[in-house]
Design a protein with these regions (language model features):
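Ankyrin-repeat boundary/"N-cap" motif
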Residues: 3-11, 34-63, 89-106, 132-138, ...
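Internal alpha-helical scaffold/solenoid segments in large eukaryotic proteins
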Residues: 73, 83, 139-152, 157
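Ankyrin repeat A-helix N-terminal signature
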Residues: 12-17, 54, 66-72, 99-115, ...
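Ankyrin-repeat-protein effector appendages
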Residues: 1-11, 112-113, 125, 158, ...
Length: 209
């Protein structure tokens, strides 16, 4: 399947056009399981960037990756019901759950309740809260780095390991106490989220002692 057909679907997903997305899936059910064959390259950066979710589309990404990143609560279960692989890894090793925990506190598209619900739905369907990408990064690392406390809470409740070190030796707690360099991480909303994340991690770690 060409990237073009899948791109048409994911464009409708990020713009929240559920009616058209459902129509495309009904007309071509294979799209639910399809993966991008090429994805972003240096020459195609503009084509494969999804501004609505702040993500590039990489080779190996699926519609579920994009729906998870957009917290689409109708599309995510639909794709899963149609056979989408919740453990699908893109060329960087990221699974849909890695995308679901990303966010930008204070941005107009940021929706903590929808994000937490998306995380829970993916885990219910078999996603691993301790899955690692090629950099050893877990969903918890990403949720902490992007200052998404609701996602952190959902992951911890599902068994995410706050002591796991990525390939650089960083644990989620270390990332929680540092400036991540992520765009928007210095905003007042992000700082409030950071304080809540540190509290969540400390409480979780204390219960494990």
């Amino acid at each position: 399947m060409s990237d073009a057909a899948l791109m048409t679907l994911v464009r409708t997903i990020v713009t929240a056009d559920d009616t058209v997305a459902f129509h495309l899936l009904a007309a071509n059910p294979a799209l639910a399981k399809a993966r991008f064959e090429i994805g972003v390259t240096r020459q195609t950066a503009e084509t494969y960037y999804m501004d609505e979710i702040g993500h590039y589309v990489y080779a190996g990404d699926t519609a579920l990756h994009v729906a998870a990143a957009a917290y689409r609560q109708k599309i995510v279960p639909k794709l899963i019901a149609m056979g989408a692989n919740v453990r699908a890894r893109n060329r960087r090793g990221a699974e849909p759950l890695h995308y679901a925990v990303d966010g930008r506190p204070g941005a107009c598209r940021w929706n903590p309740p929808a994000q937490a619900a998306t995380v829970a739905r993916l885990i219910e369907a078999g996603a691993d809260p301790n899955a690692t990408d090629k950099s050893g990064v877990t969903p918890l690392h990403r949720a902490v780095r992007t200052r998404c406390a609701a996602a952190v809470k959902a992951l911890l409740e599902a068994g995410a390991d706050p002591r796991h070190e990525n390939n650089s030796g960083s644990t989620p707690m270390l990332l929680a106490t540092q400036n991540t360099g992520r765009g928007g991480s210095g905003s007042s909303e992000a700082k409030a989220q950071q304080e809540l994340i540190v509290q969540l991690l400390r409480e979780h770690l204390n219960r494990q002692i």
